[in-house]
């Protein structure tokens, strides 16, 4: 049986369909190549992306700070800070305890909490964690904050004069060192609603006075 002979029009249409299929195939191949290339570039850039520089001018504290870094463990994990967006003020919640008492507690192998600094009853300041590492004090804000625990003589959580003055000085330095302002200083309470630091939560005006003192101290930098 002889085959069916195509008309010239049908031959023309068949050629056009074949050319269209070739163009579509070429387009798909080019598109796939572009996608693979884009993915490859993204992966390369991600792998070679420089880590964000921590916004701290120096990791070295002032001379009045006693550096007594706690050992790495549950409390000090060694995880690096992403950046510094706030300074968080806490109170130790253990009336009459000293800065050294609290630092040594942080250093126990089974302790899973710590702060960067502890301000003591005599105005002494101890650094427990490096400024480029996260502490374990401010819940979901540990990765972008510096934490300061503050000692207090009585249950009301009010800081004595020596402690208060050192806290103002340290907080102002931390702000200046990290490019922050007094408004960037917050309470643990502002993160979780916890009554910490107690006196500054119970007395909002005292908290505002503290921020004003930090702002005034910043003028010295």
Please report, for each region that a protein language model flagged, where it lies by residue.
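Short, small-residue-rich loop/turn micro-motifs
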Residues: 93, 150, 189
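Substrate-binding clefts and substrate-entry loops adjacent to catalytic sites
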Residues: 132-134, 147-159
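Soluble periplasmic/extracytoplasmic beta-strand elements of cell-envelope proteins
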Residues: 88, 118, 147-149, 186
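Short coil-to-beta-strand
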Residues: 139-147
């Amino acid at each position: 049986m002889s085959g069916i002979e195509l008309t010239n029009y049908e031959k023309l249409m068949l050629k056009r369909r074949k050319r269209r299929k070739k163009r579509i195939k070429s387009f798909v191949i080019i598109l796939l190549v572009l996608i693979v290339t884009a993915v490859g570039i993204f992966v390369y850039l991600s792998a070679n992306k420089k880590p964000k520089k921590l916004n701290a001018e120096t990791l070295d504290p002032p001379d009045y700070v006693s550096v007594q870094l706690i050992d790495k463990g549950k409390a000090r994990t060694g995880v690096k800070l992403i950046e510094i967006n706030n300074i968080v003020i806490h109170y130790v919640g253990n009336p009459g305890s000293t800065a050294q008492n609290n630092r040594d507690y942080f250093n126990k192998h089974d302790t899973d909490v710590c702060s960067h600094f502890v301000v003591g009853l005599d105005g002494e300041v101890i650094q427990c964690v490096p400024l480029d590492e996260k502490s374990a004090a401010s819940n979901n804000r540990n990765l972008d904050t510096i934490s300061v625990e503050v000692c207090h003589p009585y249950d009301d959580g009010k800081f004595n004069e020596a402690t208060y003055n050192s806290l103002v000085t340290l907080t102002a330095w931390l702000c200046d060192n990290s490019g922050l302002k007094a408004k960037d200083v917050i309470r643990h309470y502002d993160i979780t609603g916890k009554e910490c630091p107690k006196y500054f939560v119970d007395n909002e005006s005292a908290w505002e006075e503290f921020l004003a003192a930090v702002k005034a101290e910043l003028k010295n930098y």
